[in-house]
Structures are given as C-alpha cells and as structure tokens.
Amino acid sequence: MVDRLVNSEANTRRIASVENCFGSSGVPLAMQGRVLVGEGVLTKMCRKRPKSRQFFLFNDILVYGNIVIGKKKYNKQHIMPLEEVSLESIADNQTYRNGWYIRTTTKSFVVFAATSTEKQEWMAHINKCVEDLLRKSGKKPVENHAAVWVPDTDASVCMHCKKTQFTFIQRRHHCRNCGAVVCAGCSAKKFLLPQQSTKALRVCDACYERLKHVPSSLGSGEDSAAATGAASGNKLNTTAGDSSNDEDSDEETASPGGESHDEPRFYGDNSVLSAVEDSSTITSPSSATTGSLEAPQVTPSVQSSPAAVATTGSHC
C-alpha cells in the first residue's frame, strides 16, 4: 500500500524532484501524509488541439502541467483534488483509442494514453486513490461535474442556431454549462455557476432559459447551483471575446503524433496492475520510450456531458 511510503526517503525525494521540475511556476507539493503514487505523459484534448501533458498522481491530488523544451521542466501547473475526480472510459473507434474522461466540479476534459495497458494502469490507480481517500474521509463521491467542451474543430457552425458560420470574425464561444460551441448571438448572457466560478459565466441561450427557471428552493446538486445563480442576479454578456483565459493559445505548438514519451511509473502498490518497485526513483523527464498517440475525433452533441473531447473551465 502507498501508506507505507508516507515517511519514506524515496517518496520525499520524488516529490522534491517534481517541485523542482515545476520551479517557481508551481506551488509546493510536499505535505504531511502526501504520497506520489505515479507519473507519466498523457495526451490531453485542449480546446483547439491535442497536446502532451505531464501528469503526477498523488494520494490526494492529481497534478498536471505543460512540458517545456527538453522535457526537463514543466509549467502551468494545475491541481485537481481527487475527492472531486470521477473517471469514465471512452470506447475505442477507428479514429481514436485509449481515452477516458477526467471530471471534477470545476473542470472536465479527456486524456489519451499511448497504449491500452497504460490506460488501464492510470484508471486503476486513480480510482484506487479516490476510493481510499473517500473511505478515509467519510465523504460521498461528487455527483455533479463540469461539462466537457466540444472542441473548436468539431463545430464549423453554431450548435445552437445552426446558421452562423465560424470565421476569423465570427468567433467560436463555449457554453460553460453544457460545453457546446456557439456563436456570440446565441451566448449573449452570463449565469452564475457557483461550482465553477464566483463570477457569472457565458452560457448559451438554451441553458440560460433552463437555469433561470430552476426553483431556488432546491437543496443540492446542479439545480441547486443554478438556483443560487438565479438568485444572485445574472446578466447579459458584456465582454467582446470568449474570456476563457485558457492556456490553449495559438502560439503554443501541438505535440506531434508518435512523439516519444515517458512510460507511466507507479509506486508502492503492487496490487494495482503493473506497479513498479518502491525503490524506484522519479522518472527523469528526458528519458522516454516510443508510443503512438492517435489524434482524437468525436461527433459534437449538445448535452450536459457532450460526447466530445476538450476542456472546461478557465484553463486547458
């Protein structure tokens, strides 16, 4: 079990190495009781394109970041509390494979592993950590999660009005409630979604109409959050652009398919698939083995969890 690694020198050394790789762009990760369970590279579907991201699984959080030049440093660190994490496997098809959803209340997206074995390892270890954490804390699993954004490339026209053609002038926008790609005219309103932000967020007209009629007496879940938003006063969208402020910027280059990557390495629990020996030290970001990552593609749909691969929230 990973518990026996809590006070081990190997665990302390691994966490210190992760902190060093993020440098000043990250926050301190070492804390009492925290164990680094595993690490490796996954392909994450961002808003515009799939990109390689370095993931670190701890016994209480999931951390990931951008891989910087040379694969020796990482930046744009993101931390997801495991008690909020829920996974859902995505069936393989002719276009993409080895993928699954990672969902939380504030952010949801899809990742792809290089092989089916790596997918099984990642999902098994994450689920095990979530189960252990919830059991120890006595908390119940989170039921409501942020929607997965439909990728920009999957919508050439507005998914709401079916008329507006997206161009350099007619920009794409994402509904923060359902994840659909919509035009400015079909997403001119904002609504407070408390689980995602303390500020009102852009939503499509369909979601706005539904959310504003949610009774304020509801006690929990998504409808409760919507009721809170309705009671707090929502407004027209006064911003000119889609202020998602994510890291999926045009100047950031996509990682080419088939790029070499670090094989995932897991520590301390040999009962979960092919975990490595406790004595293993953290993998050097520069060491790698070859694995083919296929670019994912999906059919967009407007629903609470669109069958699409992208990102939600303010970051990618």
Swiss-Prot record:
<feature type="binding site">
    <location>
        <position position="183"/>
    </location>
    <ligand>
        <name>Zn(2+) 1</name>
    </ligand>
</feature>
<dbReference type="InterPro" id="IPR001849">
    <property type="entry name" value="PH_domain"/>
</dbReference>
<feature type="binding site">
    <location>
        <position position="186"/>
    </location>
    <ligand>
        <name>Zn(2+) 1</name>
    </ligand>
</feature>
<dbReference type="GO" id="GO:0035091">
    <property type="term" value="F:phosphatidylinositol binding"/>
</dbReference>
<keyword id="KW-0862">Zinc</keyword>
<dbReference type="InterPro" id="IPR055251">
    <property type="entry name" value="SOS1_NGEF_PH"/>
</dbReference>
<feature type="binding site">
    <location>
        <position position="161"/>
    </location>
    <ligand>
        <name>Zn(2+) 1</name>
    </ligand>
</feature>
<dbReference type="InterPro" id="IPR037871">
    <property type="entry name" value="PH_Phafin"/>
</dbReference>
<dbReference type="GO" id="GO:0005770">
    <property type="term" value="C:late endosome"/>
</dbReference>
<dbReference type="GO" id="GO:0005938">
    <property type="term" value="C:cell cortex"/>
</dbReference>
<keyword id="KW-0863">Zinc-finger</keyword>
<keyword id="KW-0963">Cytoplasm</keyword>
<keyword id="KW-0479">Metal-binding</keyword>
<dbReference type="Pfam" id="PF22697">
    <property type="entry name" value="SOS1_NGEF_PH"/>
</dbReference>
<keyword id="KW-0967">Endosome</keyword>
<feature type="compositionally biased region" description="Polar residues">
    <location>
        <begin position="298"/>
        <end position="316"/>
    </location>
</feature>
<dbReference type="GO" id="GO:0008270">
    <property type="term" value="F:zinc ion binding"/>
</dbReference>
<keyword id="KW-1003">Cell membrane</keyword>
<feature type="compositionally biased region" description="Low complexity">
    <location>
        <begin position="279"/>
        <end position="292"/>
    </location>
</feature>
<feature type="zinc finger region" description="FYVE-type">
    <location>
        <begin position="152"/>
        <end position="212"/>
    </location>
</feature>
<dbReference type="InterPro" id="IPR013083">
    <property type="entry name" value="Znf_RING/FYVE/PHD"/>
</dbReference>
<dbReference type="GO" id="GO:0006897">
    <property type="term" value="P:endocytosis"/>
</dbReference>
<protein>
    <recommendedName>
        <fullName>Pleckstrin homology domain-containing family F member 1 homolog</fullName>
    </recommendedName>
</protein>
<keyword id="KW-0254">Endocytosis</keyword>
<dbReference type="GO" id="GO:0005769">
    <property type="term" value="C:early endosome"/>
</dbReference>
<dbReference type="GO" id="GO:0008333">
    <property type="term" value="P:endosome to lysosome transport"/>
</dbReference>
<dbReference type="GO" id="GO:0007032">
    <property type="term" value="P:endosome organization"/>
</dbReference>
<dbReference type="InterPro" id="IPR051765">
    <property type="entry name" value="PH_domain-containing_F"/>
</dbReference>
<feature type="binding site">
    <location>
        <position position="204"/>
    </location>
    <ligand>
        <name>Zn(2+) 2</name>
    </ligand>
</feature>
<feature type="compositionally biased region" description="Acidic residues">
    <location>
        <begin position="244"/>
        <end position="253"/>
    </location>
</feature>
<dbReference type="InterPro" id="IPR017455">
    <property type="entry name" value="Znf_FYVE-rel"/>
</dbReference>
<comment type="function">
    <text>Functions in the regulation of endosome morphology and late endosome formation. Has a role in controlling trafficking from early to late endosomes and from late endosomes to lysosomes. Important for localization of Gdi to the endosomal membranes. May function in controlling the activity of multiple regulators in the endocytic pathway, perhaps by positively controlling those involved in the early steps of endocytosis such as Rab5 and hrs, and negative regulating those involved in the late stages of endocytosis like car and VhaSFD.</text>
</comment>
<feature type="binding site">
    <location>
        <position position="207"/>
    </location>
    <ligand>
        <name>Zn(2+) 2</name>
    </ligand>
</feature>
<feature type="binding site">
    <location>
        <position position="178"/>
    </location>
    <ligand>
        <name>Zn(2+) 2</name>
    </ligand>
</feature>
<keyword id="KW-0472">Membrane</keyword>
<feature type="domain" description="PH">
    <location>
        <begin position="35"/>
        <end position="131"/>
    </location>
</feature>
<comment type="subunit">
    <text>Interacts with Gdi (Rab GDP dissociation inhibitor).</text>
</comment>
<feature type="region of interest" description="Disordered">
    <location>
        <begin position="215"/>
        <end position="316"/>
    </location>
</feature>
<dbReference type="GO" id="GO:0010008">
    <property type="term" value="C:endosome membrane"/>
</dbReference>
<dbReference type="InterPro" id="IPR000306">
    <property type="entry name" value="Znf_FYVE"/>
</dbReference>
<dbReference type="GO" id="GO:0016324">
    <property type="term" value="C:apical plasma membrane"/>
</dbReference>
<feature type="binding site">
    <location>
        <position position="158"/>
    </location>
    <ligand>
        <name>Zn(2+) 1</name>
    </ligand>
</feature>
